[in-house]
């Protein structure tokens, strides 16, 4: 299941045009998949320094995603169980890739949601927090360039992703594998080697912070 799409050629946009676009997003709410995707496509090729209105690029890991959320779509980032665009049921994911001699590959895992052991154990896949939050994702990609400042980075593709049936069957099986260990009190035994697409991994200050 390829998550990185073909790169588009960066376009040159004058600063004054960018400023008008950024001003236009204030007070705007994106409530349909079509309007969300259209807005996402409009950022392609624009240097992120021209998008960042709040200085987020200097704040460290995750800053690029926050810039897109705050300065481009005009909403406050959150880590709640709802999708980023709840009316449309769309979750935003901004992800880097690397270009090497063997082609393009993802730079890092795509973190989907927090596993709440106290709530998820009695749910089905279709009623799970993962499915509620991530069944449709807006994936925005950029090339990670180690020798360039983040302000030079540009979003080069934006696509709406819904899982194909053949992949969805594997993802559902992976979810059931993870939850079976949770239900039987073996959550501490969870390993990324248990599954194919969907994995349980620690993310945070220590191993007690677990995400899917």
Named regions from a protein language model:
Residues 2-86, 91-212:
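Nucleic-acid endonuclease domains
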């Amino acid at each position: 299941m390829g998550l990185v799409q073909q790169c588009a050629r960066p376009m040159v946009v004058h600063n004054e045009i960018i400023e008008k676009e950024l001003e236009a997003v204030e007070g705007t709410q994106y409530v349909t998949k079509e309007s969300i995707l259209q807005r996402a496509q409009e950022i392609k090729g624009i240097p992120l320094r021209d998008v960042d209105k709040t200085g987020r690029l200097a704040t460290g890991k995750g800053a690029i995603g926050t810039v897109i959320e705050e300065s481009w779509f005009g909403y406050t980032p959150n880590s709640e169980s709802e999708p980023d665009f709840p009316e449309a049921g769309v979750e935003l994911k901004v992800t880097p890739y690397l270009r090497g001699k063997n082609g393009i590959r993802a730079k890092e895992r795509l973190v989907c949601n927090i596993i709440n052991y106290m709530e998820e154990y009695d749910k089905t896949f279709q009623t799970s927090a993962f499915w509620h939050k991530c069944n449709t994702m807006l994936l925005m990609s950029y090339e990670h360039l180690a020798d360039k400042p983040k302000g030079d980075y540009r979003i080069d593709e934006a696509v709406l992703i819904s899982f194909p049936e053949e992949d969805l069957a594997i993802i559902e099986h992976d979810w059931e594998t993870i939850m079976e260990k949770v239900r039987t009190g073996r959550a501490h035994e969870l390993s990324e080697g248990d599954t194919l697409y969907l994995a349980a991994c620690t993310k945070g200050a220590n191993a007690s912070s677990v995400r899917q």
